[in-house]
Amino acid sequence: MISSKLNNNYYNNPFTFNNNSNTISVTQKEALKKTIKEAAVLTDIALVNLNNDGPSLEISALIESKCKQLYEYSTTNTITIYNLLNYNNNNNYNNINRYNNNNSPSNNNNNNNNNNNNNNNNNNNNNSNNNNNNNNINNNNNSNNNNINNNNNNNSENNCNNNFNVNKNLDNDKYNNKSCKNNNINNNNNNNNNSENKEKNNINNNNEKENNEYNNNRSASTSPVIKRSKSLSPILQFDKIDLEEEYTSDYDYSDGSNESSSPTLSASTLSSEDSKPKVLKRGRGRPSKPKPVQCFSCFRSNTPEWRKGKDKDGNVIDLCNACGLSYMKYIKKAKESKDKLSINNLINK
């Protein structure tokens, strides 16, 4: 227990210093280190157990006793606490709590003569500025608001800024919160105000909207959600093809007079939207050379290349360079079946 340790005469006996010398014994230096460490431990206990009624009388008395000793040591000698205490205690006891004549922790930063310990949370330096007319030992973080700011997750995208006010309820576990995202405890109440996500990924809770509108963080120019039509193929919508209709082609397969041209579908077979060649970007965004039509058999991700070939009768025809199926042969099979499901079966083969 902290109280049992303080009952030892080792802590209660006053330390003697040589006012005319800047040197002290090793024993006195180590004793002063332990006294400061005890005061820091009591400060941590007071912060954890702080409530609306204030800390317990026992804790208040212990803090008062330790802070009085520290004040006397720092003002009656030319040696400052910073010169005596030059150590880093693993970030555990680097803060000395406030003390004033009211025998309780105070948040008063308006006194003209303050003895400030400005503790930098990043490098844990103990800086002490001594004034002879001061009755306060102030722990001032961030210089103005008396908040202890712990910045965790410095290597992640989101830094945690947890501001704790010593006037309200504190939870010591929150000092080590490594997964927070801008959770600030308000200085005036106990409400947890969650700030807006800087990545602007707040999605509107209205799940009935199919386009998933973003709430207050997405601009009105966001492209709408594209609804895919329910077709047998993601490339061509076969439900738009009338297989009963007579097939016509601008390409003449009877002779080789139009060998330079490529097979095309008439407007009566496919809609104008589906008859457009699919141009996909490859590499650094350079579009592939558009082809007149895709192969209905293999459905490659990009437009297949066509090569010239001959059928059994010796006629020059266009063949898919990927699967080798004739364009006209496929259409002929689809027409003869007069069944849309047969098209799907041919695709799956």
From Swiss-Prot:
Output the superkingdom of the source species. Eukaryota
Q: Which GO terms describe its cellular component?
A: nucleus
CDD domains in the cross-refs: ZnF_GATA
UniProt-listed SMART domains: ZnF_GATA
**Which InterPro entries does the entry mention?**
Znf_GATA, Znf_NHR/GATA
Cite the record's Basic and acidic residues compositional bias ranges: 196-212
Bias-annotated ranges (Low complexity):
95-169, 177-195, 257-272
Which segments show compositional bias classed as Basic residues? Answer: 278-289
This entry's Gene Ontology molecular function terms read:
DNA-binding transcription factor activity, RNA polymerase II-specific; RNA polymerase II cis-regulatory region sequence-specific DNA binding; zinc ion binding
Where are the GATA-type Zn fingers located? Answer: 295-323
UniProt entry keywords in alphabetical sequence = Metal-binding, Zinc, Zinc-finger
- Stretches for region Disordered: 95-227, 250-294
Q: Which BP terms in the Gene Ontology apply to this protein? A: negative regulation of transcription by RNA polymerase II; positive regulation of transcription by RNA polymerase II
Q: Under which name does UniProt file this protein?
A: GATA zinc finger domain-containing protein 24
